[in-house]
């Protein structure tokens, strides 16, 4: 078996993209993101590669949407999970800063 070289961010995106639920469907359907200092270089690039299916071992693209507000992204991810009867979910990421705490507040739902 050949060695696959990935950065930590690429490995995380690849890992998220292959998680399956009990029905055999993709569990993490995509990612909401606000890019800024702290996550634009590593994670942003890995999500871009995942969006276009350019990461080794990915069989289908990993969608990424750019959000405008951290709390809204978290609420959207929660609504998606509830609409799918919690059989599927969305990942959410933002840069480090005051907006990141808004995701924690939204997660209290």
What are these regions (language model features)?
Residues 1-101, 105, 109:
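Thiamine diphosphate
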